[in-house]
Amino acid sequence: AFCLLFHQGKRYCLDATYRYLPPEDIPQGIQGRKALVENGDSCLILTLPQQDASASTDSLNYHYRLMTDSNPPTLKGTATRVSTGEYKEYLLSLYHDTPKEKQTDLLNNQINNTAAVQSADGEYCLEADPHEDFFHQPIDTTRRKQDYLLPWRCRIVREVTIDIPQGYAVSYLPADFHIETNQGILSCSYRAGAGYIHFRKVMEIRRKRIPLALIPAW
């Protein structure tokens, strides 16, 4: 059960099962469904609106510097995260469910990423994609017999800027990529500037359910 509050011409959805979801947002599990609302001696039947995928956004920005003088070479820098909607509720729940002595580790934005750097003969291969999102969860396409359901509709943005030391030049960047299906979109872009590389990835899940026949393409 949940509560609908009407205040100053606006409607707020209060659901105690989502401790950290702002009242302006509606849990995706009940979006688009009909609700019976008490209205004095009568009642109202309302259809709860369905919000866009962008209402639940997770944006993660990394700013690195390639450290060629460390052993092993590494990407060192900081991370900044901004989340909204159900994604924000998920992260806040994760934080508060973590033992207090470990909560500080979750808030640490200092990154030292050695796994993203491979070197040989004075050349460096950098992996800009952080690879942590729904799109990288493995799905067994050979034995699965049912549709696959993603956690929620959302928009995920990953941006990575890597500062390159003087004396080095970018010799290769992957081609940009964009694909769009009924379930969502995935796009990646790379560009090089004066002394830096910039990577941007946008993933938008518009429909949570992936039909069994479409799983191999996904």
What role is predicted for each listed range?
Residues 1-218:
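A sensor for short, sequence-defined functional sites
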